[in-house]
UniProtKB/Swiss-Prot annotation:
This is Small ribosomal subunit protein uS4. Gene3D superfamilies: Ribosomal Protein S4 Delta 41, Chain A, domain 1, RNA-binding S4 domain. The gene is rpsD. InterPro entries: Ribosomal_uS4 (IPR022801), Ribosomal_uS4_bac-type (IPR005709), Ribosomal_uS4_CS (IPR018079), Ribosomal_uS4_N (IPR001912), S4_RNA-bd (IPR002942), S4_RNA-bd_sf (IPR036986). Residues 99-162 form the S4 RNA-binding domain. Belongs to the universal ribosomal protein uS4 family.
Amino acid sequence: MARYKESACRLCRREGLKLFLKGDRCYGEKCAFERRGYAPGEHGQLRRKQPSDYGVQLREKQKLKRMYGLLEKQFRGYFEKADKKKGITGTNLLLYLERRLDNMVYRLGFANSRNEARQLVRHNHFLVNGRKVNIPSFLVNIGDFIEVTEEGRKNNKIIEAMETIVRRGIPQWLELEQENFKGKVKMLPTREELTMPIQEQLVVELYSK
């Protein structure tokens, strides 16, 4: 599947906030956004123009897409599912994104970023309820167990990521047995538990035009 080829740090600077696309580096002094928080490009340090309502909605969609590393077709597919589902469309959208296997691998601390988690999933390093799953978009459910394979437990990226768990923390809706390389989805998060700086209602308004 096609992916963004632009520098992850440039994406953060363009959106004006940290998207945590480069894992542990985003928490340290080497983070490019900390050193150059203005937009990329020749005129990046100039004052930004006041965006239109459409521009604000578009930027919010771009932030959310890039945070989860999705392209437009797949992202819109999640929105359409969320819109058909009972409940608040924006919250439904966030929950679909959170239920992705690559996101859960990242949330459990088995990878330093969602992009890294996606690669590790594709390389057959994870089991869901005892069965190998190599599809990053696989949707997990409450009660599912996510476990690193025996081979995966020797992978340096997974080992290094798990060493930073204390700094990042594990969400309350997940349970981690660190010594067993195993996690469980205890529940799905409430909107209040998702602390991302996203106004998902703006995304709903954009797609509802």
